[in-house]
């Protein structure tokens, strides 16, 4: 089992990155927020989980233990697979997911593309007892790590727009959301801008 990777980022796609470790390139599927923190040619470390299916093996990458643990917990819900679990973490932080479940907040969970009322209710019913302690454990660590400083606005626009279209939003939806978010606060870094744009789109 591959539990972590440390190596050079050699390519970044819409939903994946390739990290080269000792001459071997590993394709890692991860969230737009995590991808936005990676830079081609630079070293990166990701915690990983391998998901094995009959027709494929996939590596999923995470910035911290809380994200990886939440990814695993979400998949214990009936009918919720790795793709939707990752979508949840693309829109909400582990703490936000846990708080929404613990508080019975189906509306917040439905901000995730692919999570309808039925799935949101199922998340709450099946995980409410399991996240009670988790919400306490991630108060300090569940927030994103320190944002990258000094990112040029044009880079932020490109990265966030690409991340949103990768999540299934149309180019126009992505452009409009990014423009609105950065007009309100031009100083946002990529991670903050992405979360603000997702919140805006999720409220529609």
UniProtKB/Swiss-Prot annotation:
Residues 152-204 are annotated as: Domain III. Pfam families: HHH_5, RuvA_C, RuvA_N. Transmembrane segments: none annotated. It comes from the Bacteria. Residues 143-151 are annotated as: Flexible linker. Gene3D superfamilies: 5' to 3' exonuclease, C-terminal subdomain, DNA helicase RuvA subunit, C-terminal domain, Nucleic acid-binding proteins. It is found in: Cytoplasm. Keywords: Cytoplasm, DNA damage, DNA recombination, DNA repair, DNA-binding. Residues 1-63 are annotated as: Domain I. GO terms for biological process: DNA recombination; DNA repair. The keyword Transport does not apply. Residues 64-142 are annotated as: Domain II. One of its GO terms (cellular component) is cytoplasm. GO terms for molecular function: ATP binding; four-way junction DNA binding; four-way junction helicase activity. InterPro entries: DNA_helicase_Holl-junc_RuvA_I, NA-bd_OB-fold, RuvA, RuvA_2-like, RuvA_C, RuvA_C_sf. Disulfide bonds: none annotated. Its main location: cytoplasm. Belongs to the RuvA family. The RuvA-RuvB-RuvC complex processes Holliday junction (HJ) DNA during genetic recombination and DNA repair, while the RuvA-RuvB complex plays an important role in the rescue of blocked DNA replication forks via replication fork reversal (RFR). RuvA specifically binds to HJ cruciform DNA, conferring on it an open structure. The RuvB hexamer acts as an ATP-dependent pump, pulling dsDNA into and through the RuvAB complex. HJ branch migration allows RuvC to scan DNA until it finds its consensus sequence, where it cleaves and resolves the cruciform DNA. Has three domains with a flexible linker between the domains II and III and assumes an 'L' shape. Domain III is highly mobile and contacts RuvB. Homotetramer. Forms an RuvA(8)-RuvB(12)-Holliday junction (HJ) complex. HJ DNA is sandwiched between 2 RuvA tetramers; dsDNA enters through RuvA and exits via RuvB. An RuvB hexamer assembles on each DNA strand where it exits the tetramer. Each RuvB hexamer is contacted by two RuvA subunits (via domain III) on 2 adjacent RuvB subunits; this complex drives branch migration. In the full resolvosome a probable DNA-RuvA(4)-RuvB(12)-RuvC(2) complex forms which resolves the HJ. This is Holliday junction branch migration complex subunit RuvA. It comes from Corynebacterium efficiens (strain DSM 44549 / YS-314 / AJ 12310 / JCM 11189 / NBRC 100395).
